[in-house]
């Protein structure tokens, strides 16, 4: 995402993006506008010499020059400008997390933040701290987690039909007939792709709403689906009204065929000493000055290893930032677990 002053002189991050070509200034491919990647690099949250597992080098001085130009436009110091870029980017991600948690009746404190993608690990701890999420899980090979998920995911197809019928006028046979027709289509499609019907699991749901609303809530099909809707509405929006008329907008069938599960690598826990994974010192810039951090090679970290921030864990597909005030440990599945704890 590109960072630049808006028409009013305030810092805006995104939605414009430098993409992969030309990419961030630090890529050295002709990019001229500061991106979140450049800000992370300038602040020492990326290692210029260990990008892509050490197979590529980022242009730190070029990124610094770009951030300096942005800082001058904003009337800030270089460090303030770089931190501003990260804060604006984090605020955007925080809003997205709130939409799928707090606004749906879920407390972020009850969950673990799983981060993935090349940049996920650089922002996850800050997001968790700001949202009150108690821990962060960085999967092994986090940068390619989506690709791995695609290869291992179950076969899923969704089918739907619009009814838009008030529930008090609805005849159960009408629902059953509509759902059976969708299931017939699902089975036929699966068979046409060489699937065995015995491997298919069919899940029925209904989109229900109060009459007059412009949005629906999906609830499992069953004899008590109206009561289930009231309960779901209360959880998500903080209220429900059993005296109001409801209506079924859509009937849905999800066809799922489970794939064989793949056993990912696991290992017994070893000791907490992570010093064998330390490959260099890293200077990280804060608003109050420099911070001395450790640079660790994720491939050398073993289950049971643990260290306190600040630190950077580098690997081919991503970098994980462990800020001051967080500890990082490796579990039996080689996941990194970041939690608030004793930092330096």
State the predicted function of each range.
Residues 2-13, 18-22, 27, 34-35, ...:
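C-terminal, non-catalytic interaction/recognition modules in large multi-subunit enzymes and RNPs
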């Amino acid at each position: 995402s590109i960072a630049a002053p808006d028409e009013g002189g305030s810092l805006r991050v995104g939605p414009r993006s430098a993409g992969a070509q030309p990419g961030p200034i630090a890529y050295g491919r002709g990019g001229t506008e500061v991106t979140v990647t450049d800000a992370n690099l300038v602040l020492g949250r990326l290692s210029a010499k260990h990008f892509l597992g050490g197979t590529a080098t980022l242009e730190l001085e070029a990124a610094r020059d770009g951030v300096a130009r942005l800082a001058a436009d904003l009337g800030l110091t270089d460090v303030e400008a770089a931190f501003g870029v990260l804060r604006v980017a984090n605020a955007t991600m925080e809003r997205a997390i709130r939409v799928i948690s707090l606004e749906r009746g879920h407390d972020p404190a009850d969950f673990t933040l799983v981060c993935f993608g090349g940049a996920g690990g650089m922002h996850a701890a800050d997001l968790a701290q700001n949202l009150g999420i108690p821990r962060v899980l960085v999967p092994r090979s986090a940068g390619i987690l989506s690709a791995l998920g695609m290869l291992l995911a179950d076969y899923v197809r969704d089918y739907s039909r619009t009814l838009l019928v008030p529930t008090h006028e609805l005849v159960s046979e009408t629902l059953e007939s509509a759902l059976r027709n969708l299931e017939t289509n699902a089975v036929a499609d699966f068979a046409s792709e060489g699937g065995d019907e015995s491997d298919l699991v069919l899940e029925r749901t209904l989109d229900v709403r109060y009459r007059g609303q412009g949005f629906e809530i999906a609830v499992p099909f069953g004899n008590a689906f109206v009561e289930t809707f009231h309960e779901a509405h209360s959880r998500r929006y903080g209220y429900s009204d059993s005296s109001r008329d409801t209506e079924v907008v859509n009937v849905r069938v999800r066809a799922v065929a489970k794939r064989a599960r793949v056993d990912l690598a696991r290992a017994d826990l070893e000791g907490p000493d992570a010093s064998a994974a330390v490959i260099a010192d890293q200077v990280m810039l804060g608003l109050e000055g420099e911070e001395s951090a450790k640079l660790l090679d994720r491939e050398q970290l073993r289950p049971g290893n643990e260290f306190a921030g600040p630190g950077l864990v580098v690997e081919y597909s991503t970098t994980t930032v462990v800020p001051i005030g967080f500890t990082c440990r490796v579990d039996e599945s080689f996941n990194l677990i970041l939690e608030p704890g004793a930092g330096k």
